[in-house]
Amino acid sequence: SDVYKREDEHSSVSANEQVTTANSVRPVVSVTTNFTKPTADTPALLTLGEVETFLHEFGHALHGIFAMTHYATLSGTSVYWDFVELPSQFMENYAVEPEFLNTFALHYQTDEPLPSSYIERIRKSRNFQAAYACMRQVSFGLLDMAYYTKPEAFTADVREFESQAWQRVKLLPELAESCMTVQFGHIMSGGYAAGYYSYKWAEVLDADAFAYFKENGIFNQYIAEKFRQALLSQGGTEHPMKLYVNFRGKEPGIQALLERDGISESVQTSKA
């Protein structure tokens, strides 16, 4: 194994396919990690961020491991761009669930579990300025779509075009010298052209899917088997929405995401 950070190693975690060609093979997937090394005094104690990152990449790995497709090119993460992050972001939800944390997040000397008050503080901290962060991501998606839905070559003033694209989501006064477009590499050279919305859409999907588990128990074997059979094993053999409905029984809604991010609760409180 090679799970710890090395000086000459790229600083990221990833899931990778190892076998892609054969008549009939079991999927072989690796999760390449970059965890903090142990020291002379302590073992390798993972940060919450490292746990979340591992769960994220493990979700991608499960997508490949459970593949049951006829063609390798349609297996695992070979799906629509706005669907590929569902399994990975779904798994991240477990990182702040007490029932999950109590299975391994124990003090390395005393075996004491994380106090419930700590877990609650972690959950609340994740929702700090969640509504603002949501609007920020939505604004980036709107700008992306504004550029890539133009039927003709772009010849307009960049700052003015950007300002108009953001009319519906402006929260703060604009700075005259600011221009997001010139540093928005994701949609110019990063592979997210006309697809930046997929970040927020993936959150809608993973929150809705995890809510299904929360309603029935986060380790519910029946729901987990549905997730594996109806969604993970199918790869890109069907349209993503059809796969999701086969698993969930309905199309996703935004309510689960709003509740997870504390936005729905805040709105209700402000109305009271």
What name fits each language-model region?
Residues S1, K5-A272:
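Cation-handling catalytic/transport regions enriched in His/Asp/Glu
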